[in-house]
Amino acid sequence: MWDAWDLDPFYRNSLRVVSDRSVSNVVVEHDRIEIHTHARVDSSTMELVWIFRSGAVGVDVHVEADWHEHEKLLKLAIPVEIHTDHAQYETQMGYITRATHENTSWDAYRFEVSAHRWVRLENASRSWAIANDSTYGWDVTRHQSDRRGTWSQVRATLVKSARFPDPQQDQGHHEWNFRIVPDASVLDAVAAGQQLNLREREVSGLPFEAPFTISGAVVESVAMAPDRSGDLVLRVYEAQGGPSQVTLTAPEATSVTACDLRYRPSEDEPHLRGGDGQWSFDLSAFQITTLRLSFTK
């Protein structure tokens, strides 16, 4: 009855690695290299493109699939050389941590985890982040190395192709984009996720300086106040999971007010210190706040 929603752990008993694959093309340009590979699974075909850009901090992966299977789960596996017992998965304005081992029954049944824009693995000396633009199911498992220690495998769930309630679920053409970033902090992972999901838009007009800069927090959204006052509304949050001192610089702003989610001034929001174009305030772990910036009319 819950075919499209449920994922049972025994799906791993019939796991099949796609072996019918080959490099089909290599494109070399002045600022990038693309390696195109093609693969086939029964009646379906896939293309995976590795994109290496000059000066980029990470590697991009573009996946396309012409999918015509039923009741088959398709995953993209990305092995990473890191010994760790946990992984971080982004939620809205924060992240959760889940074990990568199955030492307890609780851990074993967390075999699939939902994440928004990125997954991150870390230990004392290195870290990896994998950002995506359109898939939300992940599993990370720990494996014994042939040499010593362990390595981790990150797998993104691409399609499930259930038969109920839609017998044609996931049939047809699909595209996904990923970015693999080495030595990535939480803020690096957030940035990679934003870059994949919020593409740059070029607009015409005169150049201008940004009306504000902020450090110590992540800006999630910027909007004009709904009352048409000309005020600017920022929603910011602490992303790393610890207390942070935030500095907001807005040289043209006459005042900054901490508001609730409905843009109303609230004493429950962080206390703002400073003025004359620069304000500071404190945020606790994963705290969200809304700031209203007023400018001279």
Where are the regions a protein language model picked out?
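C-terminal (or distal) subdomains of carbohydrate-active enzymes
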Residues: 1-297
